[in-house]
Amino acid sequence: MVKVLVVAFGGQYNHLIKRSIERIGHEAALRPYNLPPPDEGEFDCVVFGGGPLTMPKDFDKVKGLEAYLRWKKPLLGICLGHQVLALLNGGEVGPSPKPEYGDVTIFVDDEDDILRGLAPSFRAWESHNEEVLREPPNSKVIAHSENTRVQALKYYNGPYYGVQFHPEVQHTEKGSLVFQNFVELCKR
C-alpha cells in the first residue's frame, strides 16, 4: 500500500483528492501547506492540491514547499498545486487569458506515465483564473485544452507532474486513472 501526503492549500477539493486515493486502495493524509514538511520517510509520494491562493501574488506564502522537491519522490500538482510546482521550477504563472470553469476537453499531447490510458482526449473539470503561461525549462507540456496551452506538465528534474484540471471530481472522465497512474509511479 502506498502512503500519499496531500498538501492542502485550503481548497474545497483537497478532501476529494484524499478520498480518490483511498478509493483505489491506498493511504492518504492531509497536511496544511503552511506547516513544515513531515519526516520524508513517512510517505511514498506527495500531491499539491488546489486552493484559493493566487499565483504569483501569493508565491511568498508557498516558497517553503520547495523542501518537498528535495525528497525526489513522485509529486503531482493539481490546479493551484500545478501552478506552485511550475513556479518552484522557474516557470511563469499569471492570469488566464480565457479562464476555464466547468467541463473542458483536454487533448493529450504525450501519453506519458500520468496520462496513460487517457489519449487522445478526455473531458475534465476546470476551475481556474490563473494558469502556467510559460513552462519551466526542465519540463514538457503533455496536454492542452482549447483555451489553456499548459494543461499538464512532465518534469525532467524529478518524478514530478502537474495538471491544471481536477482529476478528483466525478465530472472528470477517468479521473481515477490519473491517481492510479500516479500511485504506480510511487511504487517504483
Curated annotation (Swiss-Prot):
Its EC number is 6.3.5.2. It comes from Ignicoccus hospitalis (strain KIN4/I / DSM 18386 / JCM 14125). It catalyses: XMP + L-glutamine + ATP + H2O = GMP + L-glutamate + AMP + diphosphate + 2 H(+). Pfam families: GATase. It is an enzyme of class 6 (ligase). Keywords: ATP-binding, Glutamine amidotransferase, GMP biosynthesis, Ligase, Nucleotide-binding, Purine biosynthesis. Residues 3-188 form the Glutamine amidotransferase type-1 domain. It comes from the Archaea. Pathway: Purine metabolism; GMP biosynthesis; GMP from XMP (L-Gln route): step 1/1. Catalyzes the synthesis of GMP from XMP. This is GMP synthase [glutamine-hydrolyzing] subunit A. GO terms for cellular component: cytosol. NCBIfam families: PRK00758.1. The lineage of its organism: Archaea, Thermoproteota, Thermoprotei, Desulfurococcales, Desulfurococcaceae. InterPro entries: Class_I_gatase-like, GATASE, GMP_synthase_A. PANTHER family: GMP SYNTHASE [GLUTAMINE-HYDROLYZING] (PTHR11922:SF2), GMP SYNTHASE-RELATED (PTHR11922). Signal peptide: none annotated. GO terms for molecular function: ATP binding; GMP synthase activity. The active site is at C79, H166, E168. Heterodimer composed of a glutamine amidotransferase subunit (A) and a GMP-binding subunit (B).
